[in-house]
Every structure is written in structure tokens, then in C-alpha cells.
UniProtKB/Swiss-Prot annotation:
SUPFAM superfamilies associated with the record: S-adenosyl-L-methionine-dependent methyltransferases
Protein name listed in UniProt: Protein-lysine N-methyltransferase EEF2KMT
Function as written in the Swiss-Prot or TrEMBL entry: Catalyzes the trimethylation of eukaryotic elongation factor 2 (EEF2) on 'Lys-525'.
Binding site for S-adenosyl-L-methionine: W139, G165, S166, G167, W238, A257
Catalytic activity: L-lysyl-[protein] + 3 S-adenosyl-L-methionine = N(6),N(6),N(6)-trimethyl-L-lysyl-[protein] + 3 S-adenosyl-L-homocysteine + 3 H(+)
PANTHER family found in the cross-reference section: HEPATOCELLULAR CARCINOMA-ASSOCIATED ANTIGEN, PROTEIN-LYSINE N-METHYLTRANSFERASE EEF2KMT
A single Gene Ontology CC term: cytoplasm
GO terms of molecular function: protein-lysine N-methyltransferase activity
Localization per Swiss-Prot or TrEMBL: Cytoplasm
Species assigned in the record: Bos taurus
Family designation: Belongs to the class I-like SAM-binding methyltransferase superfamily. EEF2KMT family.
EC number: 2.1.1.-
Length: 340
């Protein structure tokens, strides 16, 4: 195989690997490129490589995606092979047979590869809305914010980070694994989200402190040289939290991703941001970064209007260069930096 062909094959394999590990929509896979490769060669070796990068990947074996998803993926892979080659590939049918007999649980796993070679694995609900909340799955803006964070580790290095509406935990876990924060506080308000969030923190190898009080009592060992940040998960209801409760966190950086669902959440979020602006003992306001997908321009406009009325200046963060995670490429997303 010529060097250019090897490079093309490697890109194709990476495309399948990243999308399958993250359980992205099948329509987003590079099927057309695969069909071209299959027409130009016997294809058996390439398909076996794809199997090893997807359903046979060590991460998927240990933390499997949805059975339904694996079944659909393998069925599509077999269709592409059969459309070009009449000779069946036993390994494909064997892999499909294994998932056809498996039960599909209510939870599945998604994994995201980091530039360091490490990965973030999340256990998520198989339903977009489960237990009355959308916080049990990872949304596009969380991936977008995590990508930006990985490119800008200095924003978080050796600092205390508070994330509002952490959901499944993707953004925070990526930051904890790549940006060396001093401490990271995941927060949400829904009991099922908090339970899943704690599980994902542990799943990714972090110890979980019981509360912020343990940090206040024993901050010493968590020095900038520490390899692992101090991590906790906190229940934080934007509508009822008080300024003294927020002051206990003493954040240097505040984050939120995909939390602009409706006008009510916008008003609640701005209320929390106003309280956070005066929460630090040294009177230095934390840096704040809010990422969102532009689903409803009116809701986004309401957010910036409310920020203005609250006296919180903002600026849009320039788009980052590197796309690390697979998400909807046609989604319009933005990150605002707020001056609290």
C-alpha cells in the first residue's frame, strides 16, 4: 500500500473509531469513503481493522455502547460489504450474532479520546429525556467547551473550577484529565443526574470528596504539583442557592455548557452568576465561560440581554482550531466569556 493510501486508511479508521466510541449517529460515519475503499480492494483487511477499532475496541469491550447501536452499526457495515463483495466475511456475521443475543440495558457507555492518549468514558441513559431531565446525556456544547478547554489549559491550571449544570460530566472530566486544575466542583440539581455524575467521576479513576468542607479543612496536600485534582460533586439549585452557599466554593473559574434551555433557566442562571460575582473573599471575581448551542436565537438573545441588565459584560470567545470530539458539524455553537 502506498504512503498516501495508508494515510487515507488511517484517517478512515480514526473517523470510525471516534464516532463509534462516542456512539454518534450512523449517518455521520464516513460511509462513502469506505465504499470507495471497498471497491478499490478486497476490503477484508480494512473491515477487520474497523471491527478492531469499533465493537472490538478495548474501551468498548470494557464499557460497551448500546446493544441496539452496535447492532445497527454492524448491520450497516455488512450492507456496505455485501454491496461490493459477494464473498461473506465471517468475522462480521459473528460479531453481529453476539450482539443479537445480548440484552439492551437502560444505560450505555460513550468514550471520548483525548490528545494525551487518555480517554473519558461516560455511563449515560439510553433515552434523551429520562427521569424528567435532559442531564443524563452529553450535549454538543459540552463537547465544544471541552475541546476549547483542552486547547487552553492555562485557563484552568492550578485553579478552583466550579461547573454549573454538569450533566453527565464530559467537560469536567476532560479538564481534570488534561488541564491540571487544583480542584473541580461538578454541580447539578437533579438527584438522578447527581447519582450518575458521581458514578462517572469514579469510572474515570478520580477519588470523590464528600463535600466542599473537606477541601476547606484540608487544602494543603492539593498543591499545584499534585497530579490529580481534588474533586467533588455538589447539589446546586439555581433558584434556591444563597450567596453564602456559593461563597463556600471560592471558584477561580465558573463554567456551564448547554444550559440555556428556556427563558426560565436563563433567568435562574443569570441570578446565580450575579451572586458568584461577589462570592470570593479576596474580592476578585471569577472568570466565567458559558457554552451553548444556538437552537433558539431568541433564548440566546434573552441571555445576553439579561447579562447586560445585570451589569455583566461579555465577549464571544474565538472559534478554536482543533476538532477533537465528534459532534454535529452543522450545529451553531458559541462560548461567551463573562466579566463577573
Amino acid at each position: 500500500m502506498a504512503p498516501e493510501e495508508r494515510a487515507d486508511a488511517a484517517r478512515l479508521l480514526r473517523g470510525f473509531e471516534r464516532r463509534f466510541l462516542a456512539a454518534r449517529a450512523l449517518r455521520s460515519f464516513p460511509w462513502q469513503s469506505l465504499e470507495e475503499k471497498l471497491r478499490d480492494s478486497s476490503g477484508s483487511e480494512l473491515l477487520l481493522d474497523i471491527l478492531q477499532k469499533t465493537v472490538k475496541h478495548p474501551l468498548c469491550v470494557k464499557h460497551p455502547p448500546s446493544v441496539k447501536y452496535s447492532r445497527s452499526f454492524l448491520s450497516e457495515l455488512i450492507r456496505k460489504h455485501e454491496a461490493v463483495h459477494t464473498e461473506p466475511l465471517d468475522e462480521l456475521y459473528q460479531a453481529l450474532a453476539e450482539v443479537l443475543t445480548a440484552e439492551d440495558p437502560t444505560h450505555c457507555h460513550r468514550s471520548y479520546l483525548l490528545p494525551s492518549g487518555d480517554s473519558v468514558t461516560l455511563c449515560e441513559s439510553t433515552a434523551i429525556v429520562s427521569h424528567g431531565t435532559t442531564g443524563l446525556v452529553t450535549w454538543n456544547a459540552a463537547l465544544y467547551l471541552a475541546e476549547w478547554a483542552v486547547e487552553n489549559p492555562a485557563v484552568f491550571a492550578h485553579r478552583m473550577v466550579l461547573e454549573l449544570g454538569s450533566g453527565a460530566g464530559l467537560t469536567g472530566l476532560a479538564i481534570c484529565k488534561t488541564c491540571r486544575p487544583r480542584a473541580y466542583i461538578f454541580s447539578d440539581c437533579h438527584s438522578h443526574v447527581l447519582e450518575q455524575l458521581r458514578g462517572n467521576v469514579l469510572l474515570n479513576g478520580f477519588s470523590l470528596e464528600p463535600s466542599i468542607d473537606t477541601w476547606a479543612q484540608h487544602p494543603g496536600p492539593h498543591t499545584p504539583e499534585a497530579e490529580r485534582p481534588w474533586v467533588t460533586v455538589a447539589r446546586l439549585d439555581w433558584d434556591t442557592v444563597t450567596a453564602p452557599q456559593l461563597a463556600a466554593f471560592q471558584p477561580d473559574v465558573v463554567l456551564a455548557a448547554d444550559v440555556l434551555y428556556c427563558p426560565e433557566t436563563v433567568l435562574s442562571l443569570v441570578g446565580v452568576l450575579r451572586k458568584l460575582s461577589t462570592c470570593r473573599k479576596d474580592q476578585r471575581a471569577p472568570d466565567a465561560y458559558i457554552a451553548f448551542t444556538v437552537r433558539n436565537p431568541e433564548t440566546c438573545q434573552l441571555f445576553t440581554t439579561e447579562l447586560g441588565q445585570a451589569g455583566i459584560p461579555w465577549e464571544e470567545v474565538p472559534c478554536h482550531d482543533q476538532k477533537l470530539f465528534p459532534y454535529e458539524e452543522h450545529s451553531e455553537m458559541a462560548i461567551l466569556k463573562l466579566t463577573l
